[in-house]
Amino acid sequence: MELIYEGVDITKDVRIVSAVCRDASGGKSDSLELVLGDAEKWYSWKPQQDDKILMRREGYSTGTMYLSAVQPEEGEFRILATAQPMAARRKANKSYEDMTLETIMGLCAAECGMRWRLHGIDGGIRYRYLLRTEESCAALLDRLAGMEGAVLKCWDGQLTMIGIAKQQEAAAVETIRVTARQPGAVHTDRARERLRQLTVATPWVQVSARDAGGSGELSETQTPPATDAATAGRWARGLLLCRNRQAEKLTVHSRFRAEWTAMLRADVTGGTAADGKWLMDEVEHDFMAGTSRVTLVRCIDTIG
């Protein structure tokens, strides 16, 4: 296990009491929570917000994290670092007129000093007009991702927008066996909470998307700034996918699994109702305990 602070390996210079990394997607920033002993040493380094820190274990890396908060606790320090620097969370008022998604990604990345990437989503999507009101770069991109049926992931100084449908079609990189009496495995299926229909309604257009896999009759109307039917239809499908994929979840505990990270495709086997195709939604790695916990969401292909 290695702890790197501002490019220097300080593993031997501190006493690590606990270290938990939360690897997330969908608007949640990856985070690293540390408790370090020997507080006097930490003071001597004069830590500042946005100092860079990362941890590695057995091939897994948190990627570069940015120091967010330091809280002294009886001779120890509780330290929180996130994958977003302060600039990515700074709110602003801006407008974006006749710009493509890749242009907006580039502008936001430059504003907060990060790199950017699109995966499984068309960077040529053009927006006639977008308004950003008291919204951070990360919040704006997360809002766009939700409308486009994508998630925003921040890792190692990079903003990445990942198309959910494309990722669901990818080959599984992990097979997880879950049995009926497996300790720590929790399968939650709230199928009745899936929307049957989501409508995008604006003064200019109204278009609905439907989920053929929903068992209830719930519907919802949202009002994003669509001005044409093509955009409204795409957003209705994207919003419905992002909403309904959260209805069925599976949580699994394991020994430390360096290969587990958010948005990877996994197949679940074991002869239970959880069998099938899933996407990793959030992973928690406990470096000191040597354990990992993954929360997965079921892949759905019934939106139209």
Named regions from a protein language model:
Residues 64, 78, 93, 251, ...:
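Well-ordered beta-strand positions in beta-sheet-rich domains
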Residues 70-83, 91, 286-299:
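Short, solvent-exposed secondary-structure boundary/capping segments
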